[in-house]
Amino acid sequence: MLKNQLAKGNNGLVRTKYITFGIKAENIREAKPKLERIEADILNNFKVLGVSAYPLSGEERLQILYETFNPEEKVPFQFSYDRVLRSGMGTKDFIAPTSFVFRDGKTFQMGNTIGAASYLQILAPELTDKMLAEFLDMDRNLIVNLHIQSLDQMKAIKLVKSKVTDINRMKIEEQKKAVRSGYDMDIIPSDLNTYGGEAKRLLEDLQSRNERMFLVTVLFLNTAKTKQELDNAVFQTGGIAQKYNCSLRRLDYMQEQGLMSSVPLGLNLIPIKRALTTLSLIHISEPTRQ
C-alpha cells in the first residue's frame, strides 16, 4: 500500500491553507467587532465558492506555530491554558524550539532543523494558480506566504500618476540629450516607451475599470534535516519560479524577519513589495477543496 501511495506521489505530506487578516486599531476593544465582521464576510465568501473554512482557536494557532518551529520534532504538541496559569509560563514556552541560530545570513537553524527564507521577485505581469499549485505539489517541507495589502484607491491613483509624471520627465531628458547630440528627438530608449504605456494603462484601469491596487510580498520558507537537502529544496523551488517568469531570491541577512513573516500572524517584516491589480491577483485564488 505504501509503495502504491509513493507511486502516486503521496508520501504522507499534508497541505494546509490559512488566511490571516488584520486591521489597524487603537486597542483590541476597537478592533474586535471589526475583525468579527471581516471574518463573517470571508467565511460567507468561501461558502459561496463551495470551500469549507472555519476560524482557528487560540490553541490551534499555537499548534501551527509549534509545528512550524519544530518540524522534525517527534513529541506532539501539548498545551492547555490551565497549565499556563498553574506553571507561570507563557505561551511562547510551549512552542519555542530548543534554539534559534541566525549566523551566516543565508540560512538559519531551529533546533536540529536547518531552513532558508526567500522571496519571489515577480517579473511576470500576473500570478497564476498553476504556479502556486506546482509549489504546493513539491515533495518537500515548504511554507508559501502571500502578504497582500490593499491600497486606498485615491492613494493608488496618486502613486501611478506620479510614476507617469516621472516617466514623462525622463522622456523629456532623453529628447534633450538626443537634440544636443544631433539625433532624432523621437528616438528614445524602448524601455521608457514600454513603461510609459504600461503606467498609462494601469492608471486607466484604476480610474475607469474599477480595478484595485495591492502591494504583494511572496515568501518561501524551505526547511530540511541537512544542508544538502535544503540546497536541493531551494533549487527545486527556484526552478518552478523561473518556469513562470519569476525569480527566487534569498533574503540575505533577513532570515529572522523572513521566518517570522512566514508564520500565520499577519505580520510582514519584509519591505520588498510588488504592486499588482485585482486582475493580476485573481488567478491565484481559484477555489479548491483541501
Question: Where are the regions that the model predicts?
Answer:
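Residue-level detector of conserved catalytic or cofactor/ligand-binding positions
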Residues: 280-290
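Extended, folded cores of ATP/NTP-driven motor/assembly subunits in large transport
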Residues: 1-281
